[in-house]
């Protein structure tokens, strides 16, 4: 799962709690990372680049990391499989990208192997 990961109190914690609320215990079986940590905020192009990262993960079996993450907020569930600082090889069967834009625009796209 590619999340925005903007390191804002209004973004990261509520999103991770919402994801955990929807997926229940299955949330611990998935990788969660933010490619925005590598690209910065690309404004209108952010969603497209994050979607391409998901397609790359599906195609190459590599989950991109959230880089430069040293200290996690204590509110973050320590059992989450956050892909921090180092990419992980994994058989990725589906990938989801959450995109939250300025002004309240929200979208989620899901890609899967056929």
Regions found by a protein language model. Name each.
Residues 1-114:
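Conserved "HGTGT" condensation-loop signature of ketosynthase/thiolase-family condensing enzymes
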């Amino acid at each position: 799962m590619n999340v925005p990961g903007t390191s804002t109190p209004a973004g990261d914690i509520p999103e991770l709690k919402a994801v955990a609320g929807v997926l229940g215990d299955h949330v611990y079986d998935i990788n969660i990372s933010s490619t925005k940590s590598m690209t910065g905020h690309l404004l209108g192009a952010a969603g497209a680049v994050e979607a391409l990262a998901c397609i790359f993960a599906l195609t190459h079996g590599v989950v991109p990391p959230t880089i430069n993450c040293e200290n996690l907020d204590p509110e973050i569930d320590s059992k989450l499989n956050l892909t921090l600082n180092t990419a992980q090889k994994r058989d990725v069967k589906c990938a989801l990208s959450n995109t939250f834009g300025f002004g309240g625009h929200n979208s989620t796209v899901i890609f899967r192997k056929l």
